[in-house]
Amino acid sequence: MDYMSAEETPTIDYLGIHEAFAESEYGITLAANVRYGKYKPAEVGNERWEELLGPDVNNLDHLVDTYHLADDFVSRTDRLQPGLLTQHDKAAIKISAIIHDWGESIIPDINYFEKTDADEAAERQAFADNLPNFYQGDDAATQELIAEATETIIFDRESRLGNIFNIIERIGYLRTGLRAAEHVREGSAPDCQSHLRWLAASVMSSDHTTRLVRQSDLLAAQHFLVLRQVDIHEAFEASRDPAIFTSLEPEQAAVRGQGLQEARVIWDAWCAGREA
């Protein structure tokens, strides 16, 4: 499908689109659910979970949180790499942030570490089937931008902009893991201590840090790593407990432990390279 040119990029009220969605039955469904729910103690309520980890762990607020991350990322890119992103690129990335999890109001959120290709396909189908209900605005240019973002960014991580948006999402995952690790380090959430340690270790055992380290052509991603270098180091330190994954099946625990070790090696090499 041919999409609009950069010169045709509309002026978008991103937060207005979100507010309209939030008031719909789909937005209300998202608002009632939390992310990283498998790590939340059963006796801890959603409000407490969100108080500890911020808006990113509310399924609805996560969309606005990602939008602000995307807005910051493109602004930093403008300063660090002028001309890398066109106005159209920036609009497509920002609208992706606002809409990317709309499908989870139909297909419940699945933890990043457990999502399969089949889960992704089901979410994509739910998104396509329900898009006319998700967005009921009558602006044709906005509708076209949403369709473009859906096809070429949200569900195509291999495209140039899809990769950039995926990096932004990974910054969000990492940031939540760092919040969890901070509570563990400070002992500020005794009602969730072991669960937050498990969450932090799960995030750090993924390839989020590795992907950011290897994305050397995106200076905004490197800038995030520099800003949070101490926090990332301390999150790895907080995840050193060898018993941290014992609640998992042995095979899963081994995979997580290996992932944590490999991510730490790559991270330490990046830090050493900066100091050389």
List each language-model region with its residue ranges.
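Post-HExxH zinc-binding segment in Zn-dependent metallohydrolases
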Residues: A122-T142
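Divalent metal-dependent phosphate-bond-processing catalytic cores, especially two-metal-ion Mg2+/Mn2+ enzymes
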Residues: I12-Y14, D156-A276
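His-Asp-centered metal-binding catalytic motifs of divalent-metal-dependent phosphohydrolases/nucleases
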Residues: T66, K90-D109, E169
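Post-HEXXH active-site segment of zinc metalloproteases
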Residues: I110-A126
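Membrane-helix exit/interface motif
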Residues: D78, I106-N111, D138, T142-Q143
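Histidine/acidic-rich helix-loop-helix segments that form or flank divalent-metal centers
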Residues: E7-E25, Q81-Q87, A91-K94, Q136-L196
